[in-house]
Amino acid sequence: MDRIQFGTLSIPSCPVDEYMNKFFDSEESLDDVESKNLGSFSEGLKELEDGNLDLLAIPAQILHGKQLEMYNSGCEVIGARTPRTPNMILVSENKLQYQPKSAIILSDSKLIRSQLRRARRGIRVLSSKAFIEINKITEKFEDELEKYSWMERLRLNGEIDGFVIPRVIYSQIEINGRRHTLLPDPHNLGDNHFLPKPYSDLVVIIGRKNFPNSIGKLLTETEGDTIWKIQDYFLGAMKEDNIDEIGFLVRHRKLSTLMLQAEKDRDLLMEQAFHDYEGEVTTSEVLVEIKIERISNDGKKTISLHRVIPYSEYQVAIVSAEKDWRKILQNAFDVDPKFIND
């Protein structure tokens, strides 16, 4: 087999080059791979078109809204890699529930701001832009690393009580404060939870059409493929501005893990879903869990959908799940047209 020419495109919140180089150094990787970093999506497509690259790995969020450009270049997504660090981190001396009244927390994600307001009433949750305008200060940032370093200085100076940062960026800058991971699973049923942003830390791999599947499977992961296909099916037609209003979690689960969680939460519906009338387990395959939610700006209202599907059925089941999700949203807006803006 000829040496594979592999390109990567990275952003601070999804350093694809680091992820892929770590994989290439592992025993699971192919031996003959030559990797190089690229500066833009268009450059990567051009390199693929010209035959200078065989494959291109990019953050999935960059591909959103650009799939027509990809198809016109004679390329397609051949697979994806499972997110390693999709959850966000709250940097603060206090856990969220112990924040003082009127504490100031910064986050540049509309979703995260709504989730924080839902979880803790009485705190001020602002974007960096709003904080700058309110305090009439002048700040410009070259990149995300510089922006989060500025937030850390504000926290150390006592001007804010905390800020929310992607886990991977937290590891790249010097932060000495306590950290609290915003997890998607509540400790107890009904407790606070924080679904990740769509495409969070998800890497997709693009190749020319008819690229050998046998090679593609060696570089992609089944769970990553599932996450990409489901999120793309639900969100592919949405405007980019609306993506940040949605929390979306897709993952593979073992039945035993789900049953333990259902027993802990006394969730009889989940316990009975995969057992027959005699109490026997009806499936032994991997399950696909889908959680999606949309929250009003003030955090007081949440619309959500939760499905657990056998892996062999998920590509059919997501068709009805996506229709149900659209109906739920439409019904909510019919009842209250200002649902999201409250």
Where would I find each of the regions flagged by the language model?
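Long, charged, alpha-helical interaction scaffolds
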Residues: 80-82, 101-106, 116-117, 125
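Small-molecule-sensing regulatory modules
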Residues: 1-46, 113-114, 118-342
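Flexible hinge/capping segments at coil-to-helix
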Residues: 89-105, 119
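Short beta-strand-centered segments that line the small-molecule binding cleft or hinge
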Residues: 44-87
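Small-molecule pocket liners
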Residues: 75, 84-93, 193, 199-205
